[in-house]
Amino acid sequence: MKRILYIVIGISLTACLTEVDLSDLRESPRLVVNGVAVAGEPLRLSVTRTWFYTDDHPNVVIPDATVRLYVNDHYEETIPFVPGDTLFNAAGSYQAAFVPKMADRLRLEVSAPGYEAIHAETVIPQASQLLEAKAVREVSTADSTVKRVVYSISFQDAVEEENYYLFRLEEGNLINEVDSMYSWRVLYLDYAEEPLFVQSTSALDQILFSQYLSGYDGRVFSDETINGKSYTIRLQTSTHYVSEATKRLRVRLYAISADYYRYLKTLQDQSDRSFANHLIDAGLAEPIRVYSNIDGGLGIFGGCAPNRMEVDYE
């Protein structure tokens, strides 16, 4: 009887197997362009192609693409491919002689043999206006063993414009007083303490998950609630030990294009601890689709104007 039972179980398990032909899901490869035009820096771009997830990570760099750059509706140059690229950690990248400036409107037209031609546009925004940066060491009123550093960064938002920003704080430890050399690290902060970063989260997330918002490499925000006003961002770090040595605070406030903001925002939303992501992890919701402004392809072509301020604190 037991032998018959094993046979029946084996037959039933075999019947549950279904072969899926993944080749039916394969699409024709498309061009992928990734690059951020930074005011004051030569334009650099990565041109690759899409690949199927069973392809075992092939080399997808496209070295023979034709990349034409237009600036303010005028042809500027055909950007050459330069082999070997430590910045992108790739076989090479497209490096232009052109250096964009604020308010420039850029357009890319990219084509390559065997692929559909694509194009993308972006605008370099005006740089942010940093007003003041401060860092103050404090002792917690609730627990005297807990020390913290409170950071206050003030800036002015442009009037009657939709503005988008990427904010990041770095801390430097003095390692060579003679040459004023610092060892820098990005500050790991909880952005949930600052209303400006909470504005883009849902009401449900603010109730359930307001205790933490990540952003090790910085966090993006818009001027939706502060349009045309001066504003002070307040954040803090808490620990049982805060070094008394003199440190340097570096504030980075990048003004970024709307498309670049939407792209970074989707990446940010993917990493946040949110109700939507819990549903996605449980298979109850569609994954967050990464934003792209490449017409006919994938990737991002963004614009950025950097600004920074450094202050010492003790």
Locate the predicted segments by residue.
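Sec-dependent bacterial lipoprotein signal peptides
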Residues: M1-T14
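A sequence/structural signal for flexible, mid-protein segments enriched
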Residues: L17-E314
